[in-house]
């Protein structure tokens, strides 16, 4: 359910804004999206894991807040590019 260190370093290198950037909103959003995908796969198998389902809802809210921040700070074009790159729906249009 968590992201492996190898996968996390791949995500960091793919979404970083500059070398050594591990905490930007783009990287955080990518890592949250990976965690959400992992939890979704877990919940397909374990349908009655309600504790995990609540954790999924918390992660979705955190990602939505990060996406709102990216849209507000960096503009709509970079936001839409990130949404397309992550393969998620645009919730604000």
Curated annotation (Swiss-Prot):
One of its GO terms (cellular component) is cytosolic small ribosomal subunit. It holds the Pfam family Ribosomal_S15. GO terms for molecular function: rRNA binding; structural constituent of ribosome. Keywords: Ribonucleoprotein, Ribosomal protein, RNA-binding, rRNA-binding. Belongs to the universal ribosomal protein uS15 family. One of the primary rRNA binding proteins, it binds directly to 16S rRNA where it helps nucleate assembly of the platform of the 30S subunit by binding and bridging several RNA helices of the 16S rRNA. Part of the 30S ribosomal subunit. Forms a bridge to the 50S subunit in the 70S ribosome, contacting the 23S rRNA. NCBIfam families: S15_bact. InterPro entries: Ribosomal_uS15, Ribosomal_uS15_bac-type, uS15_NS1_RNA-bd_sf. This is Small ribosomal subunit protein uS15. Gene3D superfamilies: S15/NS1, RNA-binding. SMART domains: Ribosomal_S15. It comes from the Bacteria.
